[in-house]
Structures are given as C-alpha cells and as structure tokens.
Amino acid sequence: MRVSFTAPGHLRDQAVKLIAGAFLLPVALLGSASASEFRTAAVSVARVDWRAAAEQLKAEIGPDSAAASRFNFAPQRRFRSHDPRSLPAIVQLNGATAALFTGISRSPVPVLLPFDTAGYFADRAHGVPSSLSIGHYQSGFRTLDLFDAGPAGYSAQFALEPGKDAAEGLPPRTFTKPVEVQITGSLLTYDINDPEAGKGEPVKALAAQYPDLRRTVREGFVRYAFTKFGVPYVVSIQCLDSKPRAKRLACREASPIAERFIKSLRIVGGKPSRPRGYLASQPAERPATPSPDFTYRPSGAILPGTGYRGQPGHADFTVYSQIRFPLQGAPAYANSQSFLNWGDCFHRGRVPRPTGKGASYRCKSSDKKLVLDETAGENYAYPWQDNFCEARDFNVGQCAQGYGHQGQDIRPASCPQRHGNADRCEPNHFGVVAVRDGVLLRSPKQQAATLLVNTSAEHIRFRYMHMNPSMMDADGVLHGRRVNEGERLGLVSNYQDYPGGTTTHLHFDVQVFTREGWLWVNPYVTLIASYEHLLGQRGREVAAEPVETPAGPPPDDVAKPEEAVEGSE
C-alpha cells in the first residue's frame, strides 16, 4: 500500500508518523515485547522543492550575466518533478561543478556551499584561466577539507586561516588556529527525544535570507539551523562558550565566522530524486543462539553515584545502525574508566588516597571498593555497563542535567603489561576498525577520528577517541579518506593530551543528524547489537549492580568545559 501526501513538510511528516504508528500499534498490542526490546531508529524524510532551488540558482547567476547563456532554466514539464531532466539547469550545474566537488550529483538535496557560483562561471565565460585557485571563489575560506555527498545528503568542512579575518571584514580573534566550519544538508533527520529542540535565538542580520534561522550553543558547537527548499541545513563550529583563548576557540569569536559563511552560501549542485517515505522504527535483528558468556547491564544503568550531580543514566534501546563492532576481535569489555579500578573518580577524590599498586580505595561518591590497578580482573570481565551519562564536563542533551560522557568506553580483550609489577596496561596491541563503509573526518594532530556514513537510510557519524594522534597521522587517518567496514583505523591506546593520559581503552560515540544538527545519542545498545553479530550469539541482560551510594547530598560537580578533552580536538 502506498500513501501520497502533498501537505506542507512538517504537517506531512507528522501525518506519516501517525499513520505509521497506527499500522504498528496492533503489532505492538499482539506481541509480548518488553520495554527493553532493541529497535531501529525512526527517521523522517524531507520533501525537496527543486523548482524553488532552480529559481534561486537563476537569481544567483543573474539573467543578464555572461554565465546565464550556459544554463537552460526553462522547466521541462513533460518529466516528473523528481526526474533530473525536468530541471536542465541543475543538470548543467552539476556537470560544471563535478570537477570541483567530487560526487556532487549524488546529493538528493540542493548543495549550498560558500562558493561564488556566478563569479566562477562569469570568469569561465571571459576566458579567465581555469588554473585560478578554487579558493578564490570561496569567500576567504581555504580549499575545503572535506566534501561528501550521498543518498542522504551532503556534508562539507571548510576552514578560515588565522590572519584572514580582517581581510574578510571579520573582527580580530584571539584563537590562533584555523577555524573549521561544517555544513550538512540532509534528506534524513532522526526522530529522537530532544528536550532542547526548537530553542535558540533568531539572527536578524540573516532573517531575510533564512527566515527560520536559529542560533544555539550546545554540545560543544555553535549551531545555525535553518530550512531551505524544504530541507534542514545546519552550519556549526566547535567552540567553547567562555572567554576567548589562544588555544580554544570561544563561541563569541566563532559566531561572526559562521554568519559570514552563511551569507556566502550559494547553490552549487545536487540532483532531484524519487521521494521516499518515513522510516518507521522496527525490531532490530539479533542472533537467536544464546551466548554462554556475554552478559550486559541494562541500558541507562550506569554505576550508582557516577552520574553528573547524582543524575541517573539515560536508557535508550535504539540500535542506531547495524555496525561492525569497532574493536577487531572479541572478547571486549564495555565499562567505566573513571569509576572502576585505577580510575580517577572524575576528580571527585579517592578515599583513602591510594599510594601504590593494589592499594584499596573508593570514590567519594560511591561505596564501591576499588584498587589502584588497571590490570584488575573486574576491568576485564562481563557484564558490560553503560557509561554514556557518567559524570564529565561535556554538554550532552540526552542526559538528565545536560552533562555526561557523550559515548561508551570499551576495553580490549586483555591487559598486556611491561613487567609483573606494572599497574598499567601497555597500549597499542589491539586493532580498531571502521564500523561501516564511510569517509573520515579528521585534521592532522587531532585526538578524535570521525567516520561519516551517508546512505539511503542513514546519516550518522561515529567518533573514535584515545588512539595516538601521531600514529593516526602516519596511517593516513585524515579528512576525505574513504574506508571499508572492517578496515583497520589504528590501535587501542591511552592518549589523552599525551601518551598515558588515560586508561587503555577506546571511547566510541554516535551522532545522528537532526534539525538541530549532529547530536550525541547513547551508543550502548548499538554496541551490544554489533558485538552480538560479531559473536554470532545473543547476550543476556542481567540486573544492575547493587552498589550503595554514601549518604548525603549528591556530588557538587562543577562543569569545567575548558578542561574537557573528549569533546574537543
């Protein structure tokens, strides 16, 4: 059965969701699924107004310009609106820009970039050499670091070099590194329970160009979200919402750059495609054969007393993507690093203060007995434990008080030691692999590597932390590299600002695209499902650990974003 809608975008999306829910309700009532049933994500699909995009391209090129003669703006109404032949100017545009932005015609949404399309074509018409740098047309932003277009939409990253601000009419800044600006336009948006959705302040200077534009600062980025041609777009810059610093970009310095970027956006390509329907949540596939060994605590069941200011965890039973497990082999152990053996208790303090290998202590916020020994057996044992909303200095909208860990920590199979008396694990023994086919997002020296996945049913990012940056640089884990699922990206290490700065583990997190931009979601159940597929066996949920929390008020955690590491480079 096919259902067609011609209502405006938001109303149509809501109608499709209601109808999908009505069809699924009888199934839910007849089944005996528990509240913890693993399910796939629900994803909304935009309806693109390509005729409006073609009209804007015509206005940007200018009807009397030297470049106008190379485009046929007459709509071909004998073709359906989703047929690229219905808009020859868009096809011609793709043919001209494909050499500049590889794969641009794969995007099912209009590609907006800070590129002077009219100036570029006028120069070609007047015989200006094609050898002129593409950066000449990019409004001061250097050649783009990344451009990725696919069935879900597109993402791009540009950078503004230090010292270019004055030349571009921007205020001076304290930050001394290049400012990286990201833009995503997506056909797909994930339907997550986002308490901050729709908030933000309008930007008067850009209201005529983008009437619904909103500016927000959340989850470590200043974000500008807007809708154009029925499509959600988000421009974002990673920044710190505090005073300017030489090594940390302040959001107040990032905002003028983002607004300069948005003012420069022009249509550069993209291709109409057949409309798609709402992707309703479904039960996730899991192996039927039970595992004799693999057990896990429930989603959201963080160690007692380890949440920010005593907050609980965030239960989320969504398998956001059927991924390959990020470590090369099994066994592996998902659990806490800060609040298990050798952990630093998130700076809350250890009591008594341990003085040597094997010394007993506990975190002030918990009665759980620990030892100063990273090699302790509990660290390398089932069951797994969620630590997505464990106390950290990172803004995470999915966590109860807005702060959490952003991802899940995973230890490898074992803890090699340099010698018998060592209380630390030797890093760089266990492989880390790509969880899906995709493209990498990472600048040299950065501590994080992100894998971007763009398919007809997914627009999702996976971030890897604590591998050694020098080794990643040497291995070519850099912007634009395409990798295959299972391809090695590096080795599990302990890098956090410097080698040995944390325990030997992989921090793994998931971001999905929403109308607010890329947001962190709990990866725990996604990892359980991927591990089960690696094993070919189904894990068993066990009760949360009964650990008492010391009497008294919850920990008075004070967020110090300037000290945060995992959410930064």
Task: State where each predicted segment sits.
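Short, solvent-exposed recognition patches
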Residues: E37-V231
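Acidic, glycine-rich catalytic/binding loops that coordinate metals and/or anionic ligands
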Residues: R286-N341, D473-E487, Y498-E569
